[in-house]
Amino acid sequence: MSKTIAINAGSSSLKWQLYQMPEEEVLAQGIIERIGLKDSISTVKYDGKKEEQILDIHDHTEAVKILLNDLIHFGIIAAYDEITGVGHRVVAGGELFKESVVVNDKVLEQIEELSVLAPLHNPGAAAGIRAFRDILPDITSVCVFDTSFHTSMAKHTYLYPIPQKYYTDYKVRKYGAHGTSHKYVAQEAAKMLGRPLEELKLITAHIGNGVSITANYHGKSVDTSMGFTPLAGPMMGTRSGDIDPAIIPYLIEQDPELKDAADVVNMLNKKSGLSGVSGISSDMRDIEAGLQEDNPDAVLAYNIFIDRIKKCIGQYFAVLNGADALVFTAGMGENAPLMRQDVIGGLTWFGMDIDPEKNVFGYRGDISTPESKVKVLVISTDEELCIARDVERLKNTK
């Protein structure tokens, strides 16, 4: 019996979940937000209770100390040594990491070097890893990479149609992201369908603030929508998704506020997508409220969002030469029935049909009609559990 913490650290946040392993029982979960800012918020949920504190938390090391002290203070653990492993979500593993690994100094250095592939994510993950290693140096730390699942893509899929020297010299290629989520929901879909994963062709749609769609052939990723960075693919909450790359130098020439490529990429990452087009929010709930009010910018943002997702799903039907099921997961994928309805409404030619009585908020499972040739599933993702499982598997290999 051991306890494992799954960590998802961002630049100013640290989301966590504590498991009793190998039973896979969730003992507590929480999030520390606004790290490095005034009025940081630490939230802990356990035994049906919710504790919230407003603090000044200056960095990730301080955040980890507060998290561990809270676990003792609220009686969730009696001592630090009850924790035998920590698993960290890392977005970009590049070509270096094809599977989860135990952290050492070299691994941490490589994660920091790979920040160029995920500038919004890897630096925060590295800070979280460093903090846990400083405070709990004797326990096993494991990195679980979003990109690992996509290392099964063929070369003709992951290479861009540019001179090959940019791949050879600079490793410019498609890496993908959200791999842990795509892997988990594909496994769960196979259970739900009562068929071996090795026989299935699945399209998995992770639709949250970040959006990625993956073509899964017999349990392996054969294509995915995110690319060299998580900026590629369909429209997202604050990210543009795919655009004509010639727009970048054009905007630098035209807009004095955009001084260089970094400014444009920052705009595409943080000020675009649903938020940028609507001028309202990156949250689909706010966009849907705008639809009810006939707000033209909300309508436009919503229509672009649906259009881009439909196109991406459609191309993966071609990649797989048909599919057995389409899986919706993540925040919007699980909780936005209107979005699911409108996406499927544009894909009926592929043989999909959903039951409106099942396509409602809170429902999980098969939402397709009995006649639907392609099953439509809503499955809650559980990246934290995948991380905890990998820690359990690797903690004795240090």
UniProtKB/Swiss-Prot annotation:
Catalyzes the formation of acetyl phosphate from acetate and ATP. Can also catalyze the reverse reaction. This is Acetate kinase. Mg(2+) binds at residues 8, 383. The gene is ackA. GO terms for cellular component: cytoplasm. Substrate binds at residue 89. Belongs to the acetokinase family. ATP binds at residues 15, 206-210, 283-285, 331-335. Homodimer. Signal peptide: none annotated.
